[in-house]
Amino acid sequence: YRVLDACFGGTIGRCANRIGGASFTIDGREYRVTPNEGNNCLHGGKEGFHKKLWEFACREHAITFAYISPDGEEGFPGTVRAEVTYRLICDRLSIEYRATAEKSTVVNLTNHTYFNLGGHGSGSVDGHVLTVRAGRYTPTDSGNIPTGTLAPVAGTPLDFRTPARIGSFLREASLNGGRGYDHN
């Protein structure tokens, strides 16, 4: 995991997805972050959160991982304390993210774990049922760079507010030219 760029199983940050041109502006100040996908910054840069060693604490049915990202790491402003808690209760897995920043910054955490709930060798995940409690998403341009706006999921292939099969819309042209889900 330290040398691969695939991010398999990783907690992604400080900013999941792409930052176009590896720069952004907060409060009138431009910040340049580490480019690692052409001219863009993908998943927090060359040494994103998925490459870090996290502290952890175990509780019954849960484990919490914590990482402190110092001010200036990969070019991002402000120290950030990130926590990710995994809970397994009955047959339900939940992943909860928390981040606290010391000053205005960019934080967008996600997980890059891929589950096939049918088990190894069971085939496609198209029939898996997914629920996502999100009413909006970040549209992207043709280079998968977020446009900076939020759009409603209603009426799109990204609407999983009620349980739906993953494969129902997986190959829609509006999903990355038919390549699948790659959205916030």
How should each PLM-predicted stretch be described?
Residues 1-184:
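An exposed, glycine/acidic-rich loop-and-rim segment of catalytic or binding clefts
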